């Protein structure tokens, strides 16, 4: 009997901080992507809570490639920690210009590993609800260490870096505040996403991802198409 051809699932890699790490929780935006891409693609979570782009750039070569499977898309979702105020949270803070260069370096590395620019999507940090996040900080014995206006500067830098790198971008900071809407419904603690926030990200990200994955086939035959008398003829064919 000839060697069996291994079935390879294409991959979508989610690379980011805690907002990505938590994306596979119930009602998370990553979980929604998994649901949409069942039997077509593996959605791989590489979210690292608390990380900034400085640390992300260092560990990226240890994360990508995951395997020899083709990569259909990579999301790069940082900025919520980079934008921490330097005088209040120097550990996570990354200066604005360095943040921008780190994002571009991440793209260069991914491209060097065979990921096309067209398959990379930046996601900006969401807006920050300062009153709610201050409560979280005070519970930990710290003063407010982020500002929405500063998060906006990092979001703008992310959008600009995306343009300079030739990659797509989902500008959450702008979209969640569009037309003066109450963005508090999108946040659970002033920084991280609520169920509605996760739904918002999933819906808007899917509009960018859909064309990149629309041609992915259903992997392995539908059960009703398997020949019950000789299943091998259905299941072992290329």
Swiss-Prot record:
Stretches assigned to coiled coil: none
Keyword check for Lipid metabolism: yes
Active-site residue list: 18 (nucleophile), 189 (proton donor), 192 (proton acceptor)
The UniProt record lists the keyword Hydrolase: yes
Matching PANTHER family: ISOAMYL ACETATE-HYDROLYZING ESTERASE 1, ISOAMYL ACETATE-HYDROLYZING ESTERASE 1 HOMOLOG
Family per record: Belongs to the 'GDSL' lipolytic enzyme family. IAH1 subfamily.
Listed transmembrane segments: none
Pfam family, one: Lipase_GDSL
GO biological process, one term: lipid catabolic process
Protein name: Isoamyl acetate-hydrolyzing esterase 1 homolog
Purpose of the protein: Probable lipase.
InterPro entries reported for this sequence: GDSL (IPR001087), Iah1-like (IPR045136), SGNH_hydro_sf (IPR036514)
Lineage, highest ranks first: Eukaryota, Metazoa, Chordata, Craniata, Vertebrata
């Amino acid at each position: 009997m000839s060697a069996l051809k291994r079935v390879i699932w294409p991959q979508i890699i989610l690379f980011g901080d805690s907002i990505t790490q938590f994306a596979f929780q119930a009602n998370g935006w990553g979980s929604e992507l998994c649901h949409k891409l069942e039997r077509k693609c593996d959605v791989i979570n590489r979210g690292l809570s608390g990380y900034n782009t400085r640390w992300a750039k260092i560990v990226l070569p240890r994360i990508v490639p995951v395997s020899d499977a083709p990569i259909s898309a990579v999301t790069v979702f940082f900025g919520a920690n980079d934008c921490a105020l330097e005088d209040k949270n120097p550990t996570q803070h990354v200066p604005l210009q360095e943040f921008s260069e780190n994002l571009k370096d991440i793209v260069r590395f991914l491209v060097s590993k065979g990921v096309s620019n067209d398959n990379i999507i930046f996601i900006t940090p969401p807006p920050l609800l300062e009153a709610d996040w201050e409560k979280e900080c005070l519970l930990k014995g710290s003063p407010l260490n982020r500002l929405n206006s500063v998060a906006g500067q990092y979001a703008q830098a992310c959008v600009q870096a995306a343009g300079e790198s030739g990659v797509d971008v989902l500008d959450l900071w702008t979209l969640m505040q569009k037309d003066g809407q109450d963005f508090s419904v999108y946040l659970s603690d002033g920084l991280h996403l609520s169920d509605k926030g996760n739904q918002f990200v999933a819906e808007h990200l899917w509009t960018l991802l859909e064309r990149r994955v629309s041609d992915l086939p259903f992997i392995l035959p539908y059960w009703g198409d398997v020949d019950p008398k000789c299943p091998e003829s259905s299941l072992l064919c290329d």
